[in-house]
């Protein structure tokens, strides 16, 4: 304990004698809260400055970087706004009990022992260094002496290390975009002038030095006052499309005092006590929590044939926490956003489609007018099965069986398996290739699509063993599953080691779809007649060939009759 007073002297002295010229140490505004079991310290860096690092000195005067250390009772975290938040237990390795009379902790007079003073004369003290850089880029440390009174359990304090704020819990200042986007004529004052920028920012408001004005930004600004009131300012531009401010109200408030105390074209300001307007209260640990909720109506546009809206539900929950052992100072203020509503489900038609793409990129597809599609044997055919006219990302498509038939009837006895239980049929010497689908502009929901390619084939007459010329149709049976991407909505194909049975078992819970039209499959090789046709120098008419044959027969018969007549005369 006796080492603490010399320590307070040596820390600033070591900074002063480090160089010939003392650097200009930047001053970081900070907020200290003294709780029952610990102290909380928040550092707010200046705009454009890097997040500062915190160091601390132990009883021997050795510096340590502050970090999360449950053994030493320190916790450090960074808020989304860039502030550094320190929480240190009064039993921390770096917190000491300081006992003094009327002198400040910088004098050389030894402190009075704790046994000789009242609790009001003793404090918990923690020395924190805030590391930063000065204008010349040199590394400097700003020392903060955090002092909390060793109060009886029925007291709690909030004290400030910067000029006296207008409230006890410092809020994050809005970013520049939220401030600059408010036109001068729409600015709603947050505090009266004159006011410093630091005090204005602690209110969570915007500051303009040229007019010394403090005003609300295009967001929700909520505060808890010392006398037990909510102060909530809501900008119409907090949502897109903008809010209907004239419909904004407290969800459970019916009295006149629950209406906005000030409303403009761009802002609505609510100010009401905790014991009214349907505010709920409960106690958790040593804190009392007060909570209320704001709601707004949707902007509905109507014309003679119907109504539309582009708004979602707006609900804003605001909460304030106070120490149950104190009736003066708020501990924290929180604004909660309502989670998005659950997806609405209803019965309705579900459209499935089987299409054939013109190339492997699936950039275009054959339409009704393009059928029948003519393909040569062993040409690839790119097939796609998809869910149509749905936007639910939780839906998935399962492809069970796909097969081909020589006619429109999907139940034809003559058929060839393409996919069996969602996997390529291994009995084919040209196996079907499954094609993965990635998210893209034309496929925003990849789980809606299944793609595969097959090689063109021709059905063969079982008895005569010749290829059947005629149309070939494709068919698939599919099912819809939820949620997409889970094991119940995915088929894994094993490594094929033996010939798979080709029987297709159609599930009763699946739907069957077919291609929009047939395919005409042609032989890629030429027969003898085609070769003769190709090698001829001129086209050969079949009727001319018939006449030539008939003439030859007649000439041969005439010659034969003449030969027999001459022989008879002899």
Curated annotation (Swiss-Prot):
Membrane topology designation: Single-pass type I membrane protein
GO MF terms, alphabetically ordered: acrosin binding; structural constituent of egg coat
Extent of the signal sequence: 1-19
UniProt cross-references to PROSITE patterns, sorted A to Z: P_TREFOIL_1, P_TREFOIL_2, ZP_1, ZP_2
Protein keywords: Cell membrane, Cleavage on pair of basic residues, Disulfide bond, Extracellular matrix, Fertilization, Glycoprotein, Membrane, Receptor, Secreted, Signal, Transmembrane, Transmembrane helix
Disulfide bridges in this chain: 402-476
Location(s) in or outside the cell: Cell membrane
Glycosylation sites: 68, 237, 337, 477, 535
Record Pfam families: Trefoil (PF00088), Zona_pellucida (PF00100), ZP-N (PF23344), ZP1_ZP4_Ig-like (PF22821)
Name of the protein in question: Zona pellucida sperm-binding protein 4
Organism: Felis catus (Cat)
């Amino acid at each position: 304990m006796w080492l603490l007073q010399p320590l307070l002297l040596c820390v600033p002295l070591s900074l002063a004698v480090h160089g010939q010229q003392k650097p200009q140490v930047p001053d970081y505004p900070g907020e200290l809260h003294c709780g029952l079991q610990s102290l909380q310290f928040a550092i707010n860096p200046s705009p454009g400055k890097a997040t500062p690092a915190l160091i601390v000195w132990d009883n021997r005067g050795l510096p340590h970087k502050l970090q999360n250390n449950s053994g030493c009772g320190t916790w450090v975290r960074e808020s989304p706004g860039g502030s550094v938040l320190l929480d240190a237990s009064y039993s921390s390795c770096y917190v000491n009990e300081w006992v003094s009379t009327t002198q400040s902790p910088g004098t050389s007079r030894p402190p009075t022992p704790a046994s000789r003073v009242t609790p009001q004369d003793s404090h918990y003290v923690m020395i924190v260094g805030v590391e930063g850089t000065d204008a010349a880029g040199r590394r400097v440390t700003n020392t903060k002496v955090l002092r909390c009174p060793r109060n009886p359990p029925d007291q709690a304090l909030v004290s400030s290390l910067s000029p006296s704020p207008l409230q006890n819990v410092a809020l994050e200042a809005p970013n520049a975009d939220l401030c600059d986007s408010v036109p001068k004529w729409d600015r709603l004052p947050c505090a009266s002038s004159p006011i410093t920028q630091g005090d204005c920012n602690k209110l969570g408001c915007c500051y303009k030095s040229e007019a010394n004005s403090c005003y609300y930004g295009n967001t929700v600004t909520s505060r808890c006052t010392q006398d037990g009131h909510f102060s909530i300012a809501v900008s119409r531009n907090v949502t897109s499309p903008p809010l209907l401010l004239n419909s904004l109200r407290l969800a459970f408030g019916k009295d006149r005092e629950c209406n906005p105390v000030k409303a403009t074209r761009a802002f609505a300001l609510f100010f009401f006590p905790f014991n009214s307007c349907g505010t709920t209260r409960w106690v958790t640990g040593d804190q009392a929590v007060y909570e209320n909720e704001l709601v707004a109506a949707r902007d509905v546009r109507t014309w003679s044939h119907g109504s539309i809206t582009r708004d979602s539900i707006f609900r804003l929950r605001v909460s304030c926490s106070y120490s149950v052992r104190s009736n003066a100072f708020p501990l924290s203020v929180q604004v909660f956003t309502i989670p998005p509503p659950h997806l609405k489900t209803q019965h309705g038609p579900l459209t499935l489609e089987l299409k054939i793409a013109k190339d492997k990129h699936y950039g275009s597809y054959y339409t009704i007018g393009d059928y029948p599609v003519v393909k040569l044997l062993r040409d690839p055919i790119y097939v796609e099965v998809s869910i149509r006219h749905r936007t639910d990302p939780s839906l998935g498509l399962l492809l069970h069986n796909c097969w081909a038939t020589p006619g429109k009837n999907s139940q034809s006895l003559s058929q060839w398996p393409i996919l069996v239980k969602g996997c390529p049929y291994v009995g084919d010497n040209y196996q079907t290739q499954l094609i993965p689908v990635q998210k893209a502009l034309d496929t925003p929901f990849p789980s809606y699509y299944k793609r595969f390619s097959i090689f063109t084939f021709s059905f063969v007459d079982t008895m005569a063993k010749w290829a059947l010329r005629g149309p070939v149709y494709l068919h698939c049976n599919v099912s819809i599953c939820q949620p997409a991407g889970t094991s119940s909505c995915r088929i894994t194909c094993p490594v094929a080691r033996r010939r798979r049975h080709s029987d297709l078992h159609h599930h009763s819970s699946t739907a069957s779809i077919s291609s929009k039209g047939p395919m005409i499959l042609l032989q890629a090789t030429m027969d003898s007649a085609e070769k003769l046709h190709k090698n001829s120098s001129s086209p050969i008419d079949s009727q001319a060939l018939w006449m030539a044959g008939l003439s030859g027969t007649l000439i041969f018969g005439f010659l034969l009759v003449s030969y027999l007549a001459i022989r008879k005369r002899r």
